[in-house]
Amino acid sequence: MSCQGPVCTNLGLKPGQRLTVKGIIAPNAKSFVMNLGKDSTHLGLHFNPRFDAHGDVNLIVCNSKKMEEWGTEQRETVFPFQKGAPIEITFSINPSDLTVHLPGHQFSFPNRLGLSVFDYFDTHGDFTLRSVSWE
């Protein structure tokens, strides 16, 4: 079962700041999505852990989107997620990229859109949001 999650706007996240998301992955999860960007049409990071979706199994797919144009996918094979389990994910904003901090693993994704401020966050899919914090 998938549903639209909350949308946060006017976050004002700049290099040196980070966004931490906590929640519970659904017991029957196929995938979930977290987006960070300027707005819903300018996504600096589309973060999509896939348990079994779009032909991918236990894979994290990241991308960027400007208007309706998607960039090239970046795929991460380290998959620290478990169905039905709590998770904490932190996104650190850097001048030229974002660092995604996961349990026992981290990776970077380039700031392809050259955003100086990340104002937008949304999440949807097989994930129940418990908290969002930024500093």
UniProtKB/Swiss-Prot annotation:
Amino acids binding a beta-D-galactoside? 46-50, 54, 63, 70-76
GO CC field: extracellular space
- For the keyword Acetylation, the answer is yes
Gene3D superfamilies with a match to the protein in the record: 2.60.120.200
The signal peptide, as residue positions, is none
Residues of the Galectin domain: 5-135
Q: What InterPro entries does the record tag this protein with? A: ConA-like_dom_sf, Galectin-like, Galectin_CRD
Quaternary structure annotation from Swiss-Prot or TrEMBL? Homodimer; disulfide-linked.
What is the protein's given name? Beta-galactoside-binding lectin
